Amino acid sequence: PEYHLIVTEGTDTEPAYFDEIRKIINNSYRDRIQLDIEGEGDNTISLFEKAKRKAFESPNDYRHVWVVYDTDDFPAEHINKTKTLCEQNTTSDICFHAIWSNQCIELWFLLHFGYYQADIHRSEYWPKLTEWLVNIGEGEYKKNRSDMYSVLRPYMDVAINNAKRLNNINVGRTP
């Protein structure tokens, strides 16, 4: 199978979200693809370095390594440098991908329910998520909730469209 590694900045929320995806992929497509998740709890550039080291030290022959981080309050040059490092270290054998959310993964979660611009403070995301989740009968939002992918999956098309819309108004801006 083709091996993929997802290395996240977060140690709770992001790994829990991606672990649900990992279970689906590894169970459904085990002959074609295998996905591993690592929550590292590090900043942008250091996270890339850890992801690269894990990929090359692993007995798995990773073809794709996904470096996932929030922009938080990191300087834009760190966010852009991580993306550049991914591009510069990609070869015909391994492809590095930088994926970030602005400012945190909870914005991605919110985009499943409506269009939000990133100019609302991240402290407002949790109450809004709880409101939406209660409305659909899924209870309160908690930071390391292990079922978020399953809860959000039916709304994925909405989230993708809202993310594209948000991206389009931010073209050319630093993250």
Task: For each feature predicted by the language model, list its residue ranges.
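Short acidic, Gly/Ser-rich segments with clustered Asp/Glu that frequently serve as metal-coordination loops
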Residues: 10-14
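Short hydrophobic beta-strand that contains or immediately precedes a catalytic carboxylate
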Residues: 5-9
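C-terminal accessory helical subdomains adjacent to catalytic cores in phosphodiester-
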Residues: 1-3, 15, 19-38, 45, ...
